[in-house]
Amino acid sequence: MDXKXYVDLKERFLRYVKFN
């Protein structure tokens, strides 16, 4: 699994949660 991509997805998810 690509770590970088995983971190990018995680960061996007956290931002999405913050907005809600």
Swiss-Prot record:
GO function terms (MF aspect): metal ion binding; metallopeptidase activity; tripeptide aminopeptidase activity
GO biological process, one term: proteolysis
pH-dependent activity: Optimum pH is 7.5-8.
Location (main, coarse): other
Entry's EC annotation: 3.4.11.4
Subcellular location field: Cell envelope
Keywords, sorted A to Z: Aminopeptidase, Cobalt, Hydrolase, Metal-binding, Metalloprotease, Protease, Zinc
Regulation: Inhibited by the chelating agents EDTA and 1,10-phenanthroline, by bestatin and amastatin, p-hydroxymercuribenzoate and some divalent cations at high concentration.
Family: Belongs to the peptidase M20B family.
Function as written in the Swiss-Prot or TrEMBL entry: Cleaves a wide range of dipeptides and tripeptides, but does not display activity against larger peptides. May have a role in the survival of F.nucleatum in the subgingival environment of the mouth.
Protein name stated in the entry: Peptidase T
